[in-house]
Amino acid sequence: MNAMTAFSLNGAAPLANADELEAALRQIGAARYHNLHPFHRLLHGGKLNKGQVQAWALNRYYYQSSIPIKDAVVISRFRDRATRVEWRHRIEDHDGDLSSEGGIERWLKLTEGLGLDSGYVESTQGILPATRFAVDAYVHFVRDRTPLEAIASSLTELFAPNLHEERIAGMLAHYDFVNPEIMSYFKRRLEQAPRDADFALRHVKQHATTPAEREAVCNALIFKTNVLWAQLDALHHAYVDGHIPPGAFVPQGF
């Protein structure tokens, strides 16, 4: 077992049923979700300057724009039509369609509102190497692991609404360069994330029928929390500690 993602909650015994699995998943979120990361505390508490917020939004774009790619890979793993139909709306949520904008367009409203050129953002040429490695690892995970683990890795959405609420309130309160219009991505996700999380949780509780499968589900969630945490580690190292790697975005005045 990979020590980086090994499931261990206080030396607990193997998970015996679906209810124990859900409790373990929620415990993982309480201990490992990236709302706890110091960078988020700085971001939501108004402790960053505009250039640091720009760097966060720029790097996070790569994650946001990769989500529909990840979800297309998840869909490709299932012969079951009902699961594909249920998962398909996630792609539409982020990509949008001919008549409505999606999450990626809303994220570009954020980066534009922060003063970044959309062409530069979409090129991803200024993102941190660790951002690219972490996000690509997530896409590869859903491609290479079991379909059950692929769905389980999305369960960070269980914990996202509280983070979005904290982000909306904190950033609007503390930054004069932030307004409600450019925060529309997070407001929309307050509706979408619970729906997505409910389906994923029902799926893993139904289909993880052995202790080994329940452990694999927990490890998938731990892996995903590591993906999110690693991105913030890199942002903190580069833009708070001041160690920006060659080729990465350098905010004005840095």
Swiss-Prot record:
Transmembrane domains' residue ranges: none
MF terms (GO), sorted A to Z: pyrroloquinoline-quinone synthase activity
Domain of life, source organism: Bacteria
Pathway: Cofactor biosynthesis; pyrroloquinoline quinone biosynthesis
EC number(s) on file: 1.3.3.11
Broadest EC class assigned to this enzyme: oxidoreductase
One of the protein's GO biological processes: sulfur compound metabolic process
Database matches in SUPFAM superfamilies: Heme oxygenase-like (SSF48613)
InterPro entries: Haem_Oase-like_multi-hlx, PqqC, PqqC-like, Thiaminase-2/PQQC
Coiled-coil intervals, chain numbering: none
Catalytic reaction annotation: 6-(2-amino-2-carboxyethyl)-7,8-dioxo-1,2,3,4,7,8-hexahydroquinoline-2,4-dicarboxylate + 3 O2 = pyrroloquinoline quinone + 2 H2O2 + 2 H2O + H(+)
Keywords carried by this UniProt record: Oxidoreductase, PQQ biosynthesis
Biological role stated in the UniProt entry: Ring cyclization and eight-electron oxidation of 3a-(2-amino-2-carboxyethyl)-4,5-dioxo-4,5,6,7,8,9-hexahydroquinoline-7,9-dicarboxylic-acid to PQQ.
Family in the record: Belongs to the PqqC family.
NCBIfam families, A to Z: PQQ_syn_pqqC (TIGR02111)
Name of the featured protein: Pyrroloquinoline-quinone synthase
Organism: Rhodopseudomonas palustris (strain ATCC BAA-98 / CGA009)
Gene: pqqC
